[in-house]
């Protein structure tokens, strides 16, 4: 009885290892909002306090007319009102983030109130988490409308990061369309954080603008490209000198050049249109890094743990490939061998089995596969299409004579 209770006891801390991003993102958004307010206040303070002193001194010394003093005060009031509007907008975002954090903490707190895995409340909590993981996967895959609808139907809008991923996908799609405006605006809003990033997103975007200027072949654009490079690319000379030297070569080689490595057909060429897909992927990686989001969908991470517990050497053998062998019966019962999960599990480690369970009457077939004799005979009857005196391998579909079976002895 004690062993049974131990096996079903719920360890909340282990379960929450997968849910760290649930609280990490709201914390990151709150930190960014605080930094934004801090920058706004400091910028306005640096302007208003000196301007106020200057206006007061000028008024006392009669250096300006009353109308000029009023105009200066009106200008300062306008800036303060603009600051107030910006801070009110940030405050609304902050309230939303705090509400999300509260709902997420409550969701995780419910897990600590569940004593056993057999409790019906655990099934309910797990269902909510599964819905969250599915929505997360759909958002990362670009199915934003379906993800929003699912989150709304399940009532988990505060437990998923809809707005963050919608913005991410919108900017990523704009890059695939060949537009850099939204991505550069995002870089400007996150300039301070990008300085600590391992990716050089802004440099790559400015480089792409330079490439597009030269792609036209217009001589007028040539001068614009040179000015653009001087303004936006040269500041990266210390870290991106190799790429800048390659980019300088574009001034001598037009888009239709056959010279390596600038010709259009070369995938590594700066003229290649595949660079837009590269920029889109680079933006997504940078975005996730700045917001402390996992690079892989949480659903994949959760599945990987279970897949490694089920995986055996036969799951990816030449005989059980679900894509090449339609006779395989493992495709319907083994998650690893299923079409949907086969590739995801390919790089997973095999399950560690401390105990071995062996059939009492093992035999080996000519193809090297080992089964229990009685179970093989029963399975052959169930599969049908087997002549008398023959058996069918349930994994590969091959048919052999019973006389070809050899008894296996385990030492």
From Swiss-Prot:
It comes from the Eukaryota. Residues 171-228 form the CTLH domain. GO terms for cellular component: cytoplasm; GID complex; nucleus. A zinc finger (RING-Gid-type) spans 334-396. Its main location: cytoplasm. One of its GO terms (molecular function) is ubiquitin protein ligase activity. Pfam families: CTLH. Residues 133-165 form the LisH domain. One of its GO terms (biological process) is proteasome-mediated ubiquitin-dependent protein catabolic process. Keywords: Cytoplasm, Metal-binding, Nucleus, Zinc, Zinc-finger. It is found in: Cytoplasm; Nucleus. Involved in the proteasome-dependent degradation of fructose-1,6-bisphosphatase. Belongs to the FYV10 family. This is Protein fyv10.
């Amino acid at each position: 009885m004690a062993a049974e209770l131990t096996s079903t006891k719920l360890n909340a801390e282990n379960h929450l290892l997968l849910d760290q991003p649930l609280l990490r993102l709201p914390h990151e958004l709150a930190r960014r909002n605080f930094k934004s307010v801090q920058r706004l206040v400091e910028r306005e303070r640096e302007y208003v306090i000196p301007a106020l002193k200057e206006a007061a001194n000028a008024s006392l010394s009669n250096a300006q007319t009353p109308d000029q003093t009023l105009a200066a005060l009106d200008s300062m009031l306008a800036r303060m009102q603009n600051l107030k509007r910006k801070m009110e907008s940030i405050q609304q975002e902050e309230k939303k983030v705090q509400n999300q954090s509260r709902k997420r903490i409550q969701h995780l707190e419910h897990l600590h109130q569940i004593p056993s895995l057999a409790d019906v409340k655990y099934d309910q909590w797990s269902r909510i988490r599964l819905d969250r993981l599915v929505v997360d996967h759909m958002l990362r895959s670009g199915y934003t409308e379906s993800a929003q609808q699912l989150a709304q139907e399940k009532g988990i809008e505060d437990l998923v990061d809809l707005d963050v991923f919608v913005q991410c996908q919108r900017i990523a799609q704009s890059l695939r369309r060949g537009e850099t405006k939204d991505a550069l605006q995002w870089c400007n809003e996150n300039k301070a954080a990008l300085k600590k990033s391992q990716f050089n997103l802004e440099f790559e975007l400015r480089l792409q603008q330079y490439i597009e200027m030269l792609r036209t072949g217009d001589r007028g654009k040539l001068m614009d490209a040179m000015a653009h490079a001087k303004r936006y690319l040269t500041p990266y000379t210390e870290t991106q000198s190799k790429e800048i030297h390659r980019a300088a070569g574009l001034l001598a080689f037009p888009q239709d050049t056959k010279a390596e490595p600038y010709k259009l057909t070369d995938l590594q060429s700066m003229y290649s249109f595949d660079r837009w897909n590269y920029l889109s992927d680079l933006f997504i990686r940078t975005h996730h890094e700045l917001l402390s989001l996992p690079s892989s969908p949480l659903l994949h991470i959760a599945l990987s743990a279970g897949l490694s517990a089920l995986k055996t050497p036969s799951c990816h053998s030449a005989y059980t490939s679900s894509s090449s062998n339609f006779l395989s019966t493992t495709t319907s019962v083994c998650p690893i061998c299923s079409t949907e999960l086969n590739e995801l599990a390919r790089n997973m480690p095999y399950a560690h089995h401390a105990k071995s369970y062996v059939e009492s009457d093992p035999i080996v077939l000519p193809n090297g596969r080992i089964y229990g004799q009685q179970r093989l005979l029963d399975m052959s009857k169930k599969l049908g299409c087997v002549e008398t005196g023959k058996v069918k391998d349930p994994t590969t579909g091959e048919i052999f004579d019973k006389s070809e079976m050899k008894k296996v002895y385990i030492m």
